[in-house]
């Protein structure tokens, strides 16, 4: 069976989103263990998805996009990523956003 290989890439915006959520959990909720657990879950979910990046339903956006967005659910959060396939020999899973599930995502994704 043919298996695609994806290279992993992150946008700075993803790190900003993640830092914002982790900082909130640590500083406002006073729960560093929960923040650390969330980081572990996020890393694990991304690494598990990497070999199968295009095997899930794309996110249906009202805007036309060059690359389809995909989602990974982690607790009450959603990781958004795209697969950049401009070069079939260099497929990139680019992780773009980390948003709270209750956030208005209309103009964020």
Task: Say what each PLM segment does.
Residues 44-73:
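A short, surface-exposed loop/turn module that caps and links secondary-structure elements
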Residues 2, 58, 86-89:
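Inter-domain helical "communication" segments and dimerization helices
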